[in-house]
Amino acid sequence: MNRHSTMSRRTFMKVLGLSGATAGAATLATPVFHDLDEVMASPIAERKLPFWVKEVDKPTVEIDWKRMQRFDGTQTVFNPPSFGKAIGKEEEERLRKIGGLFGEAGYGRVVKENKPGNRHRDLAMSLGARFFQHPDRYAKWKPFLGPQQAPTPQQLGIPKYEGKPEENSRMVRAALKFYGAATVGMVELDENTRKLFYSHDAFDKKQVIFSDVDEPQETDTQRVIPNRAKWVIVFSVRMAPANIARAPYPASQATVGLAYSEGAIIANRLQEFLRALGYHCMAESNIMGSLANSG
């Protein structure tokens, strides 16, 4: 029987960043994973929640979906250009002139103070970690559509992959955790959950529309999601709580920026994975949270 390269459970857990057992304990049982099928059959592909967490079909807070409308992402304070509307143009201009800790104009001033946690090397660590959190600035491809480098089943002359929903969810969860995700979930896309998508991207202001098209599209003014898209895949990336607690110092920025950068890269990996299986996968075009409500 042909097998792919083997990997012990302990090694696989290390790759996922989940290995916390001692070497002695780890040697008690070391099953191996020969391929993705075996990973899918393992607990790695399961969504285990604490006993006090209960999954329900509807949110515990009642939502009047008939009244709910899609919101323009550019009108949130998560989007810097909207700051002026929240704090006033005069205050916004004053803050821009002095350069805050998070603005490039303030980097030099903060570093010159040479305070612990705000020194030059702290800033450098933060900037390095945050490099790819805005993929549209650096990627040669459109992040919404993905790299589109993986060969499709059609190009390979083979049928696209098809499986049962439960099998598919385990496969996607296993793949995403291997790529670096901490938790993975799926949400069905229907007339109600579509309202959670912004009408316009929070950062570049492109209109986000659903349309009867066969493939996703992107123009200079729009991002088009096919109506036949039925599922949203969501995932999280771990951050270090101790570093986050140091906000607004660079250590916190580095932790958050690294997670957002990793999130963009993980999304690209998922896009290529699903493309190779024969499916379209659209991702947020900019920093996580620019396409739909999140949190």
Question: Which residue stretches match the model-derived regions?
Answer:
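N-terminal export signals
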Residues: 11-34
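Extended, low-polarity segments enriched in aliphatic/aromatic residues
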Residues: 43-67, 267
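Catalytic cores of enzyme domains
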Residues: 162, 173-174, 179-295
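A short, surface-exposed helix-loop junction/capping segment
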Residues: 146-157, 250-251
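N-terminal secretory signal peptides
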Residues: 1-7
